[in-house]
Design a protein with these regions (language model features):
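Positively charged n-region of N-terminal signal peptides that target proteins for export
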Residues: 1-5
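Sec-dependent N-terminal signal peptides
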Residues: 6-15
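Surface-exposed, glycine-biased beta-strand/turn segments
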Residues: 14, 18-80, 89, 111, ...
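Histidine-centered divalent metal-coordination motifs
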Residues: 47, 97, 128-134
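Short histidine-centered loop motifs in beta-beta connectors
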Residues: 55, 61-62, 71, 88-114, ...
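Short peripheral tails and domain-boundary helices/loops at the edges of structured domains
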Residues: 134-152
């Protein structure tokens, strides 16, 4: 079976499932957005996204159309990651700890396209998807928002 075709099909299924059928409470959240004790360092730190407990190799679809701003390993603890800018909403999404990245900087990505695979790269305790949602704050600066609002 063609791996890319399977990945695109699986990712589109996950995207439809996520946005239309799954409630935030049903997502496999292994670490919530907000303040927490970091599982490796033991420090009290702000967690800028949510960790979703998907198996290594699970396809990751882009949640919205967007432009790839970062793609690869930036040695910032996220391991392999993709940062997408979504001009229609003036927001960003980051997908981190990926085992494989399928997109390149400046590439335009359509909603549902597989951008990579869930992995365990960077500063992690195991395979998962770290998902961030970055929006304009009240003062015009970009701020982290709880990604689970996308499912409410």
């Amino acid at each position: 079976m063609n791996r890319k075709l399977f990945s695109v099909g699986a990712a589109l299924f996950l995207l439809l499932l996520f946005q239309f059928c799954v409630h935030a409470a049903d997502l496999p959240v292994t670490s919530a957005f907000g303040w927490r004790v970091h599982p490796i360092s033991g420090e009290w730190k702000f967690h800028t996204g949510v960790d979703l407990g998907y198996a290594e190799g699970t396809p990751i679809p882009a949640l919205f159309d967007g432009i790839v701003i970062q793609s690869g390993n930036y040695t910032d603890g996220f391991g392999n990651q993709v940062l997408l800018y979504h001009p229609a909403y003036d927001t960003y999404t980051r997908y981190a700890h990926m085992s494989d990245v399928y997109v390149s900087v400046n590439q335009y990505i359509m909603q549902g396209i597989v951008i990579g695979l869930v992995g365990a790269t960077g500063y992690v305790t195991g395979a998962h998807l770290h998902l961030e949602y970055i929006v304009r704050g009240a003062n015009g600066d970009y701020v982290y928002a709880n990604p689970l609002i996308l499912w409410q």
